[in-house]
């Protein structure tokens, strides 16, 4: 049997991830003999901590070992298993990414034009998100249709956000757009 593909591993990992209330955000398989690696990225609305990731990693290792013993997987000379969460440089591509980063700054890059806004609430259908931008002393509220979202990445912020921005980001979609 050949080294397992991402599709085969995803089919094994996703039910276990779901049992931990994790979403499988990324899976990368690198075949390089004894230096082969399987890198798994998971996330959840409650942000997995290191202890949860350790337990999940152990269970994935046991799952892979059992599948190898049954002849369903073959990692060959071995592999390194890496389990982590997506970093802040991970693009926001799905509604859950926007929901999980509510209140944070996001850098949007559309047609070479960059802008920075604070992420607010999503509408009930999770098709639009509120964006809050400061224009001098005024706050401007716009909505972004997620289906046509430009490249968006969370911005690291060192200063505490202004109270009026935070309050607007915490308001509901309908309140913010009224």
From Swiss-Prot:
Biological function: Required for maturation of 30S ribosomal subunits.
Gene Ontology terms describing biological process: ribosomal small subunit assembly; translation
GO cellular component: cytosol
Signal peptide limits: none
Subcellular location: Cytoplasm
Name this polypeptide is given: Ribosome maturation factor RimP
Xref: Gene3D superfamilies: RimP-like superfamily, N-terminal
Domain of life: Bacteria
NADP listed as a keyword: no
Family according to the record: Belongs to the RimP family.
Keywords from the named record: Cytoplasm, Ribosome biogenesis
């Amino acid at each position: 049997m050949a080294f397992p593909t991402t599709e085969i591993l995803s089919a094994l990992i996703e039910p276990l991830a779901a049992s931990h209330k994790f979403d499988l955000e990324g899976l990368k398989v690198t075949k390089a003999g004894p230096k082969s690696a399987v890198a798994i990225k998971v996330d959840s609305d409650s942000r997995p901590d290191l202890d949860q990731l350790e337990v999940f990693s152990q269970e994935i290792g046991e799952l892979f070992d059992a599948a190898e013993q049954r002849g369903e997987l073959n990692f060959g000379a071995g592999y390194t298993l890496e389990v982590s969460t997506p970093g802040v440089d991970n693009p926001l591509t799905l509604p859950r990414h926007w929901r999980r980063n509510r209140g944070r700054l996001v850098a949007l890059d559309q047609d070479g034009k960059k802008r920075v806004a604070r992420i607010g609430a999503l509408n009930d259908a999770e098709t639009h998100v509120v964006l809050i931008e400061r224009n001098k002393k005024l706050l401007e509220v716009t909505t972004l249709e997620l289906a046509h979202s430009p490249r968006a990445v969370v911005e690291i912020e060192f200063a505490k956000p202004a109270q009026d921005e935070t309050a607007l980001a915490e308001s509901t979609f309908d309140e913010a757009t009224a």
